[in-house]
Amino acid sequence: MRRTFTAEEKASVFELWKNGTGFSEIANILGSKPGTIFTMLRDTGGIKPHERKRAVAHLTLSEREEIRAGLSAKMSIRAIATALNRSPSTISREVQRNRGRRYYKAVDANNRANRMAKRPKPCLLDQNLPLRKLVLEKLEMKWSPEQISGWLRRTKPRQKTLRISPETIYKTLYFRSREALHHLNIQHLRRSHSLRHGRRHTRKGERGTINIVNGTPIHERSRNIDNRRSLGHWEGDLVSGTKNSHIATLVDRKSRYTIIVRLRGKDSVSVNQALTDKFLSLPSELRKSLTWDRGMELARHLEFTVSTGVKVYFCDPQSPWQRGTNENTNGLIRQYFPKKTCLAQYTQHELDLVAAQLNNRPRKTLKFKTPKEIIERGVALTD
């Protein structure tokens, strides 16, 4: 028999999901099936919907439970109506629209009433077509809802009709009852999951590390680097694809300016040569330091420093947050190059186009200016 849920049980499902509990565990707690839990969460993308306020004239769940009890006791419709101080016609319509006297169920009837109730007001993006067009254009450029919202506030401060919160964009994407933005546009988000995950959602561990010879630890970086006060201090890492393909990613700590470098291989010789060539193409003002993890690919860091003048600092083992700017940027890059993509098929020009898109996205941490604006204000980049 199909499992039905009370409003309290539904609320607990969303709360458990928000706290990082998986489908199977939630199902065990509520005595249900994982697929049922997924279906419930899917309709709103894992976002807990606001509790609907019912009009006084509408039947409540407790009244529906009394109707069910009265029907089981073979009471007449009129007797049930008298006990509830309701009109007999109200009780009669309620029973008939919910499978009749024999099969009436209070929880099912209440859930159906909630589904059938009209939304109190139209969705913002249903009403505002110019705003919807702008939001959709930016989503297709892989801007996040937060970037879209912040950019509108910064660039169109006097146009109050072009204001929207990030959460409204998320809800319009994920709530399937809202059709202003088709839910398939979720694919443009950084993480195109069918459900939004809570902050406590589990993640897989990081890859192994090696002992770097003569490597300078990150704790010896100057305060000036840590405080992001000047350009030219970079964080870097590799992003890997199928068929042993790799690219190197570099992010300036102050401006968040991104560079993507095509690699012939992951070995230290190939990586050292590619990074050396790239850094030597930059003006000296942008060649100050590089923070990397403890991967084998930068074992020739001393040669790199001699060739470029760029000091290399290494993170602690299993500590990706120590170069969090680069980790975040790699997540953005994965929008363009999902896992199981062969990265060798892309030319340097194509990688540069992706970097250009990232560098022209407004960032909240930059007060919704773009990395390109910040770095061009500090120094003119050369080709």
Swiss-Prot record:
Gene Ontology terms for molecular function: DNA insertion or deletion binding; sequence-specific DNA binding; transposase activity
Sequence ranges assigned to domain Integrase catalytic in this UniProt record: 213-379
Highest taxon of source: Bacteria
GO CC, any one term: protein-DNA complex
Keywords assigned: DNA recombination, DNA-binding, Transposable element, Transposition
Xref: Pfam families: HTH_38, rve
Gene Ontology process terms (BP): DNA integration; DNA transposition; transposition
PROSITE patterns registered for this protein in UniProt: INTEGRASE, TRANSPOSASE_IS30
NCBIfam families per UniProt: transpos_IS30
Summary of the function given for this chain in its UniProt record: Required for the transposition of the insertion element.
Family assignment from sequence similarity: Belongs to the transposase IS30 family.
This protein's name: Transposase InsI for insertion sequence element IS30A
Organism for this UniProt entry: Escherichia coli (strain K12)
